[in-house]
Design a protein with these regions (language model features):
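Early extracytoplasmic/lumenal segment of secretory-pathway proteins
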Residues: 20-86
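Extracytoplasmic ligand-binding site segments that recognize negatively charged/polar headgroups
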Residues: 64, 74-216
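A ligand-binding cleft/hinge motif common to bilobed small-molecule-binding domains
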Residues: 79-82, 213, 218-236
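Ligand-binding "clamshell"
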Residues: 84-92, 113-117, 229-241, 302-305
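Periplasmic-binding protein-like
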Residues: 102, 125, 185-195, 233-257, ...
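A bilobed periplasmic-binding-protein/Venus flytrap-type ligand-binding module shared by bacterial periplasmic
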Residues: 128-135, 171-172, 250-264, 269, ...
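Mature extracytoplasmic/periplasmic domains
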Residues: 256-316
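Conserved C-terminal helix/tail region of periplasmic/extracytoplasmic solute-binding proteins
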Residues: 312-341
Length: 341
């Protein structure tokens, strides 16, 4: 009897160790998940959160297509349809995500994922310009700071993200972010090759923000949350949406089709949708929360900041990127041409 009991206890101990060593593999943008939130999830669910980061959506997709063994990734809205077509995602079991009820109705049933079959909105924001003030000089709030040599205010940084940068140049020329007109794209290529020669180089949104902070650049194309964190560090910096218009985006939590830990991944999504956790995330990232229940817990100073919570007039100037399907190859060719010249 004692041998049986010993064997049972040994098995129970091994099971306990195995459960404690369970891993959840998350592939996410850099500076997008607070450490205290990650630690709280690990403690509550007796697991290890393994976080890998990326700086642009295209590199994330390439790694996932190459067989990266992740559970959760965070693609932008326009990339979801392509991932579904390639059978890279597994459907969400919303019965396992009761906190879905906290999601703002504006982010339910999105056009890129009807009925939230595959996605839950994580954060949303804009693409714009982060710049340094200079006494006695007011910058023109225009994309011309980057694309017109006569209006360049000093050293500039171009965002190292194909759709974001090409979209900015298209907006400067008064065109849609989603143009597939070969003549327009050729003109944009020439514009960006010229801007590249005059810039301090390509950089991620985080790195671009840092160059403005360290004064090696006067202006950078960045995401709104990066600008919000930068403005907090240096009051002489600010963020604006150019008058020609720009991009609004939604990043989403998805579970990969080959996710090793699907159940734990759904627990993570449900955890993120808790009001307190959602607020912690957005107070840290300074991007806008899609969690209606979290909004009352957001720092009031952030809610007043139009760089993070844009007003109705600003929203009218913003456009979503769309999945271009086969025409994506036009952008791939364009990007290769820009980078190689």
């Amino acid at each position: 009897m004692s041998i049986i009991r010993f064997a049972f206890l040994a098995c129970a101990t091994l099971f306990s160790i195995h459960a404690a060593e369970q891993h959840l593999n998350v592939f996410i943008w850099s500076e997008y998940l607070p450490q205290d939130v990650a630690q709280e999830f690990e403690k509550r669910f007796a697991c290890k959160l393994v976080i890998d980061v990326y700086e642009d959506a295209e590199s994330m997709l390439a790694k996932v297509q190459g067989g990266g063994a992740y559970d959760i990734v965070v693609p932008p809205d326009y990339m979801v349809a392509a991932m579904v077509k390639e059978k890279l995602l597994t459907p969400l079991r919303l019965t396992n995500i009761p906190n879905f009820k906290n999601l703002d109705p504006k982010f339910r049933n999105p056009p890129f994922d009807p009925e939230n079959k595959y996605t839950i909105a994580y954060q949303w924001g804009t693409v714009g310009v982060y710049a340094r003030r200079k006494e006695g000089e007011t910058l023109d709030e225009s994309w011309s700071l980057f694309f017109d040599p006569q209006n360049q205010p000093g050293p500039i940084v171009l965002i190292n993200s194909m759709r974001d940068l090409v979209g900015a140049a298209l907006k400067y020329r008064g065109q849609t972010l989603n143009s597939t007109d070969t003549k327009q794209l050729k003109e944009v290529r020439d514009l960006l090759v010229d801007a590249k020669k005059r810039s301090v180089g390509f950089a991620s949104s985080v790195a671009g923000k840092n160059k403005v902070l360290e004064k090696s650049a006067r202006a950078a194309i960045v995401y709104s949350g990066e600008a919000g964190r930068g403005m907090e560090q240096d009051k002489e910096t600010y963020y604006f949406i150019p008058k020609e218009g720009s991009q609004i985006w939604v990043d989403n939590l998805v579970i990969l089709a080959k996710a090793p830990h699907r159940d734990l991944a759904e627990k993570f999504i449900n955890f993120v949708l808790e009001p307190e956790i959602g607020a912690k995330i957005s107070n840290y990232t300074q991007f806008t929360t899609p969690n209606a229940a979290a909004k009352k817990l957001i720092d009031p100073e952030l809610l007043k900041n139009e760089a993070i919570y844009p007003g109705e007039e600003t929203l009218k100037k913003l456009e979503f990127l769309k999945d271009l399907g086969r025409d994506t190859k036009l952008y791939d060719q364009l990007w290769t041409s820009i980078k190689s010249r």
